[in-house]
Amino acid sequence: MLSIKLIDKYYPEENELKHILLTHSRSVADKALWIADNHPELSLDRDFLYEAAMLHDIGIFLTKAEGIYCFGDKPYICHGYLGADLVRSEGYSRHALVCERHTGAGLSLEDIVKQDLP
């Protein structure tokens, strides 16, 4: 499976961070598949949904969020585009779009400027 291979590449050790990532990503993937199964009229690509859901947070290890064992140097909000860069470099540009676009929903321009978000 593409997603597990990439996760294992960037998270080679079995540790709390990998456990958190996998648990969360599986929950997101399960919800995405539930939506696909309950809305056949959308004709969604289940394989893509699963893989993209599993990979959407792959960039978290590059961020600073010590509460979830992330000891990188970038703000957590950056994990989307950081993960997209990783996934894109592996040749999966469609999956990268999901990584980079899943963060920031509901933020106004004023919030972004006020909080000095990237």
Predicted regions and their residues:
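Active-site flanking loop/helix segments enriched in acidic
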Residues: 2-24, 61-72
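Divalent metal-dependent catalytic cores for phosphoryl transfer on phosphate-bearing substrates
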Residues: 41-118
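General structural signal for secondary-structure boundaries
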Residues: 1-3, 13-14, 42, 108-110
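A positional/architectural concept
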Residues: 10, 27, 34, 39-40, ...
